[in-house]
Amino acid sequence: MNDILFIIQARMGSTRLPGKVLRPLGSNRLLDILVHRVRQSAFYQKDRDNLVIATSDKETDDILEAHCIKQGFRVFRGSEERVLDRFVKVIEAVKPSVIIRLTGDNPFVDPELLDVMIQAHFDQGSDYTYILNAPLGICGEVVNANLLIDISRIQALEDQYQEHVTLYIRNHPALYRVQFLEAPERFRAPQYRLTIDTKEDYESIKALYQKAGERPDVSASELITLLNRNPDAATEREAD
């Protein structure tokens, strides 16, 4: 398990909420809170610093790279649209066997859930592992690095599979050892979203974070409890 790599996919160029990954949340930035939380995982290795930020090579992300360097985060840059290629570039440079894919607009990824998911991935010898029925934005995905390299080499790979890194695996589960875990009971609240896509999401998350005392270490289960006390919260998922 020494060659695990956490990869946080982040960029400044969101169409609905530009610059969201560096927006303030309490006294910190969204990205900084996420990095802090991931570093609480039992699988984070401080001596190796097995966490990187993968951003684009667009000029608009120069400010993000500068922020990462200032904060001491390892940062890699690659294609903005061909995100799979960006990940492969990181994999070829660092050479992990397993990656944990995270996105910079999910500041409340829970380290306990990360540990459950990663351990299950190894225990079951899976190719891909994901947690079901948790709030959107608190998990991430575990995937064997060689799979992403293999997928990137598929002839005439559709654009959607370049943009969405693990979508090919999810759309072709018969080809891989895919594991979908049920969220532990205290995290089981699929009706909520703890991700930031829009200005409304951001304002809702800010309000929730304030209620939680603006603590970077707050458990996702505690946030769920706060949301349960306010069933009309704007962070509820819209019905399909």
Swiss-Prot record:
InterPro entries: Cytidylyl_trans, Nucleotide-diphossugar_trans. Pathway: Spore coat biogenesis; spore coat polysaccharide biosynthesis. Coiled coil: none annotated. GO terms for cellular component: cytosol. Belongs to the CMP-NeuNAc synthase family. This is Spore coat polysaccharide biosynthesis protein SpsF. It comes from Bacillus subtilis (strain 168).
